[in-house]
């Protein structure tokens, strides 16, 4: 039983180490001097209200988010109310 736990932890560490980080660096915006709290021109701010971030709405009116805020590369889904490109999002710190 301990071997299975050790092997699963080793596999998780190997997958984490193999994850490319060059795409994440490109998505962080300068934010126009806002300390990284705003999105670039090519990105859209998205508010996620749920704990699991499954329900994310585009911030149309520019209001504050009560949940988590993310900058997303929307591409083809610009103008939609529901963000379908959840993998292209980076959380705003």
UniProtKB/Swiss-Prot annotation:
Subcellular localization, as worded in the UniProt entry: Secreted; Secreted, Cell wall
Phenotype seen when the gene is deleted? Does not affect mycelium morphology, wettability nor growth under stressful conditions such as toxic heavy metals (Cd and Zn), oxidative stress (by H(2)O(2) and menadione) and plant-derived organic compounds displaying toxic/antimicrobical effects (caffeine, tannic acid, gallic acid, quercetin and caffeic acid). Leads to a reduced capability to colonize Vaccinium myrtillus roots.
State whether keyword Disulfide bond applies.
Answer: yes
Q: Which residues form a coiled coil?
A: none
Disulphide bridges:
39-71, 47-65, 48-56, 72-89
Q: What induces it?
A: Expression is up-regulated during mycorrhizal symbiosis with Vaccinium myrtillus.
Q: Which residues form the signal peptide?
A: 1-26
Q: Which UniProt keywords apply?
A: Cell wall, Disulfide bond, Secreted, Signal
Q: Which family does it belong to?
A: Belongs to the fungal hydrophobin family.
Quaternary structure and partners: Self-assembles to form functional amyloid fibrils called rodlets. Self-assembly into fibrillar rodlets occurs spontaneously at hydrophobic:hydrophilic interfaces and the rodlets further associate laterally to form amphipathic monolayers.
Summarizing the function annotation, the protein's role is: Aerial growth, conidiation, and dispersal of filamentous fungi in the environment rely upon a capability of their secreting small amphipathic proteins called hydrophobins (HPBs) with low sequence identity. Class I can self-assemble into an outermost layer of rodlet bundles on aerial cell surfaces, conferring cellular hydrophobicity that supports fungal growth, development and dispersal; whereas Class II form highly ordered films at water-air interfaces through intermolecular interactions but contribute nothing to the rodlet structure.
Q: Would you tell me the protein name for this molecule?
A: Class I hydrophobin SSP1
Query: Source gene?
Result: SSP1
